[in-house]
Amino acid sequence: MARPVSERTPAPLLLGGPTGAPPGGGALLGLRSLLQGTSKPKEPTSCLLKEKERKASPPAATVPGPGLETAGPADASAGAVVGGGSPRGRPGAAPGPGLLAPLLWERTLPFGDVEYVDLDAFLLEHGLPPSPPPPGGPSPAPSPVRTPAPSPRPGSCGSASPRSSPGHAPARAALGAAGGHRAGLTSRDTPSPVDPDTVEVLMTFEPDPADLALSSIPGHETFDPRRHRFSEEELKPQPIMKKARKIQVPEEQKDEKYWSRRYKNNEAAKRSRDARRLKENQISVRAAFLEKENALLRQEVVAVRQELSHYRAVLSRYQAQHGAL
């Protein structure tokens, strides 16, 4: 059954604004109302009460928004038709204050936001080893890797953050906990071995300056008994060399060739004796230092053994009371 003509809402009122508004503004208001969502249906009684209050209140000039005219007494009837409901409770699409908000196509999306992520810090956060340095040459300083963060699509209606979604937070927390547990296990492992050559014993050793002078090569660095290391060949016992049998040369055969050869032999013998004496002096000074260091280390070993026996006794009493570990 068709409704009476008085109950039908004219098409311009559904899409248009108040009376006297330009035709373009009415279409824009209708499009805005459709995009912003239809309002909930109002009860006829509430609409009538609002209409009575509007008639009773004095006309006030309001600042119109884009496409809206100033509400006055001349358009009260049009507002009643638009805002008021039909007998069946079907209200018209009345423009509300929410229409003054910026529209979707007027919003600016942050397409230029770029985040900088440190790759090594990201890997360490998740318990992964950092990127290995390139082979050969010193490793360069870690530079931040420019990684563009994912930005939302132009057509998306929500203001999604460019970072990862909250659903990834439990996975990141689990990875962080695993990395921390792995770091704790690594710290409780046996420490790496120490090079014994780099260990220095705290002791006072002041060798005689004359012995150091005899143990040093003239024009070279002073001999240091604390750091000097002898090779295995140098520490091998040297065999006793027998002297060569002397050969008597008559005076008439001692010419220039004989004297030059004898001079060279004497110089070689002198260099050999000096080198042997230098090595003997170095070994003696080094041996004096090692003897004193050995005595000090023996005292430390005795103290460590006493402490070890004490801890073993404590451990045995604990195992006897609470069982084996």
Curated annotation (Swiss-Prot):
GO terms for cellular component: nucleus. Gene3D superfamilies: 1.20.5.170. It comes from the Eukaryota. The modification Phosphoserine is found at S86. InterPro entries: bZIP, bZIP_sf, PAR_bZIP. Keywords: Activator, Biological rhythms, DNA-binding, Nucleus, Phosphoprotein, Transcription, Transcription regulation. Residues 255-318 form the bZIP domain. Disulfide bonds: none annotated. It is found in: Nucleus. Residues 283-297 are annotated as: Leucine-zipper. GO terms for biological process: regulation of transcription by RNA polymerase II; rhythmic process. Residues 29-38, 71-80, 88-100, 166-176 have a biased composition (Low complexity). Residues 257-279 are annotated as: Basic motif. Residues 129-153 have a biased composition (Pro residues). Residues 221-236 have a biased composition (Basic and acidic residues). Belongs to the bZIP family. PAR subfamily. This transcriptional activator recognizes and binds to the sequence 5'-RTTAYGTAAY-3' found in the promoter of genes such as albumin, CYP2A4 and CYP2A5. It is not essential for circadian rhythm generation, but modulates important clock output genes. May be a direct target for regulation by the circadian pacemaker component clock. May affect circadian period and sleep regulation. Binds DNA as a homodimer or a heterodimer. Can form a heterodimer with TEF. This is D site-binding protein. It comes from Bos taurus (Bovine). The lineage of its organism: Eukaryota, Metazoa, Chordata, Craniata, Vertebrata.
